[in-house]
Structure formats: C-alpha cells, structure tokens
Regions:
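Extended beta-strand/beta-hairpin segments
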Residues: 1-45, 55-139
Length: 139
C-alpha cells in the first residue's frame, strides 16, 4: 500500500492513492481554509469507514439491510507528554433492529477491520527525510 502527500500551500495537503485524491486542511482558527478534514479526523474517518465496511459485509451476508448503516468514531486528545489520540470508541448503528446474535456478529466482523487491528497492534514506523532530488522523484 502506498499514498503520497503533497503540500499545496498554507496548511493544505493533497493526499493521493491510485486514481483518488483528497485534501487535508486545518480550521481557519489554525491558519487553514477549512476545506478538508484534519489529519486526526482522517484517522477517525479511516477507522470508521473500515468498520462500516465490515459491518455492512456482515449485514449483507446475513440478508439484513445495509443502506443507512452509520458509524460514529470518537476519541480523546491527550498530552502525556506527547500529543496523541486515545480511548477510541466505534459505534455502529444498523438500519434495522438486531438480535443479540446479529449484534455480536457485527461486533466480531468490525473487529476484523484492518485499521482497527493496526491501531490495536501498533506498527513500527520508519521516518526518512530527503532533500529536493528525492522529492522530485516522488512525483
């Protein structure tokens, strides 16, 4: 998997993956134009959309309605001593009443989400900083 991120000016960045792109920005109170989600919001969006995918797959497999399924993801921001996000909560609201069996099934399905599991088992992250020549080759 690979994405590229390019600075557009001010505090905006274009994020590209394959044929798709989105803009990351900051609120006007932080010098942005508020034209896109912030990086922390994108992390929540990634977790929520992954959870939604797995929830909908479970519902579809069990011949239950999927359209209108909603996922809400919340977290807390802390500084201890580094600023980070913690205490994530994923809430899945199916468009139909669920039996206890199906409620548990949705929960188990969401627990297979790649993003969910990555956050539960943090990966190693390597950081490499390069100069102008390497940056030109990224395009």
């Amino acid at each position: 998997m690979e994405i590229t991120v390019e600075h557009l000016g001010s505090v905006q960045f274009e994020i590209r993956a394959g044929n798709h792109s989105i803009i990351s920005d900051q609120p006007t109170s932080d010098g942005g134009f508020d034209e896109g989600m912030t990086p922390p919001e994108l992390l929540l969006a990634s977790l929520g959309s992954c959870a939604g995918y797995y929830a909908a797959q479970y519902l579809r497999k069990n011949k239950l309605a999927t359209e209108g399924t909603r996922v809400r993801v919340t977290c807390e921001k802390v500084k201890d001593p580094l600023a980070r996000m913690t205490n994530f909560v994923i809430e899945v609201d199916a468009p139909v009443e669920l039996s206890d069996e199906h409620r548990k099934g949705v929960e188990e399905a969401v627990e297979h989400c790649l993003v969910h599991n990555t956050l539960l088992h943090p990966p190693k992250i390597a950081l490499k900083v390069a100069g102008a020549v390497a940056a030109k080759n990224m395009k």
